[in-house]
Design a protein with these regions (language model features):
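Amphipathic alpha-helical polymerization modules
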Residues: 1-134
Length: 134
């Protein structure tokens, strides 16, 4: 029983960590919208979650860090999420690839997904709590 609860919480923790990391990347894109030659960055949430849970299909293995203080691998691979540069939808004179419409929409979508995950976890804990009541 406790193993099942631990597995579910581990999945939820991993998913929330990836959502928070994606939120950081999207916020960074928005903050650097006027920075010349800045390239918008993002992660593919589905493949990052599969990679973090050890379900990746082939591909390169991530370097293991034995301490949180170690420098990250090139490309910002955190939580098993490989950072990708978003392709330009409209060319910019200063070389910046940030589209504020795309970034705001992705930020809002990610925030909604994060809120849904938190609501799911909260409901799960309420169910467990009611099951343990005499």
């Amino acid at each position: 029983m406790t193993n099942r609860i631990d597995q579910e919480l581990s999945f939820s923790q991993t998913a929330l960590n990836l959502r928070a990391y994606r939120q950081e990347l999207l916020a960074s894109n928005i903050a650097n919208a006027d920075t010349p030659n800045y390239k918008a960055r993002d992660i593919d949430f589905k493949s990052a979650l599969n990679g973090a849970l050890g379900k990746s299909q082939g591909g390169a293995l991530a370097l293991k860090q034995t301490s949180e203080r170690h420098l990250p691998a090139p490309g910002g691979n955190r939580f098993g999420a490989a950072v990708q540069y978003r392709s330009e939808q409209q060319s910019s004179v200063d070389g910046n690839s940030v589209s504020m419409d795309v970034e705001r929409a992705a930020f809002a979508e990610n925030a909604i997904q994060m809120e849904a995950m938190l609501t799911f976890i909260n409901g799960h804990f309420k169910t467990l709590n009611s099951a343990m009541q005499p």
